Amino acid sequence: MTAVHDGVRKQALRTKSSHTGKRPDWGLIGTAIDFRLRLVFTTDDLVPVSARRGHAALTRNHPEAAALLGELTAAIASLLAEAPPQSADRIELPESSENDLLRLCVVAGQLDQLYRSYLHVIDKTPLLDGGRAVTFDQARAQVPWFVIDQLHDQVCLANTGLGELRARAGIARSGISFSGSDSIDGADADLLVDGLFLDFKSTHAATTITKSDVYQLAGYALLDFDDEHHIDHVGIYWTRHGIKRTFSLPGFFELLGATETVPELRAGLRVELAAYNEQRQRARDAARNAAEHRETADAEASRESGEEIPVRRIHQTPRWLSRVFQR
């Protein structure tokens, strides 16, 4: 059961014949179309902060990747600067330019993956080859055509799905964070256009707003504790369907059964998160103190007995070992 049901049904884009049989990385495709559609509305952040952080993580272990971010940023800027003028409601660039831009968005998406889940993706990221970081030209060239086809189809749909919004857009920002973002270890939203917070979904499923979607929209809106971004509408755009659904912020919470105003809900969430984080910090402090107490007791027992510490135990207590070396 979903909290909000719009009754809209529109078939999603079909997978093209360029599929080679290998399971596509749908998450990467979703991230790349997100980044591409952000560039439709604002070019203030050519490479999203999450991708920049992923590059920083990659460079720490592979310093030869240092130039990748600068070259990626410069390539996006150059491509957009050279694009021919288009009507205000036009999303898609000429085919060759569009495909080139999509390749760059995929590379940015691969960097984003390193930020989101470094340990899980570092062994399979295309940004490494034989244990070394690939060059920017290699990263761009190796993006599969199947991925480009999938993304290009979604950009074509956006001509009608987002064209009107783009034509009348005034102030747009992407990858925004909120005053409450740090309270949940970071949260950044896709796009804010003239007070409309819009989240992109690249799911194949029907365009029904699921419970998790509702929680996400509500959470982002309420994390703007101080109304810094002046959000007055929230919505979802389904990239594979070309459908957008929006709600006024008060109306959205009324649909969810809220009996308090948005400012009251924000104040309540701020108090709840502060209490939760305080409790979590106390638990961390207690665990750290207990661990330090155990390490001290172990070290004293070892000195008194004069026995060697088993190798297995040393591996289990790296913090204790580092202190021994310091002494």
Can you name each region flagged by the protein language model?
Residues 189-206:
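Conserved catalytic cores of phosphodiester-cleaving nucleases, focusing on short active-site segments
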Residues 10-14, 18-24, 57, 166-192:
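Active-site metal-binding core of divalent-cation-utilizing nuclease and nuclease-like domains
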Residues 198, 235-237:
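Hydrophobic/aromatic beta-strand patches that form the interior of the parallel beta-sheet core
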Residues 146-179:
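Short, conserved active-site entrance elements at the starts or edges of catalytic domains
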Residues 215-234:
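Metal-dependent nuclease catalytic cores in nucleic-acid-processing enzymes
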Residues 238-327:
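Domain-level recognition of nuclease-like catalytic cores that cleave nucleotide substrates
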Residues 1-154:
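Residue(s) in the substrate-gating loop at a strand-loop-helix junction
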Residues 206-215:
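Active-site-adjacent loop/helix micro-motif of nuclease/hydrolase catalytic cores
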